[in-house]
Amino acid sequence: DTKELIHRRVLELQQKKKLTNYRLYTDLRLNPGNVNAWLKHNDSSKMSLDCARQIYKYAKSYPSVR
């Protein structure tokens, strides 16, 4: 499942780059409840594939912590 793969990658990037859920949904202007449901509880019913891709692209381009 594509969303499952994106979910795993986003979590890896969040850990590596110290990127919080708050930063994701605030900067991308997404619904906090849906983003948290997807990232914390892997509830993919709350996340469209387009939003998942948008989050992944943002996380990938987010600068790394030094």
Language model regions located:
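Alpha-helix N-cap/helix-initiation sites
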Residues: 3, 21, 45-49
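Conserved hydrophobic/aromatic packing and binding residues within compact polymer-binding modules
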Residues: 10, 24-25, 35-38
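Residues within the helices of the helix-turn-helix
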Residues: 11, 22, 53
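DNA major-groove recognition helix of helix-turn-helix
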Residues: 14, 39-40, 51, 59
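DNA major-groove recognition helix of helix-turn-helix/homeodomain DNA-binding modules
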Residues: 48-65
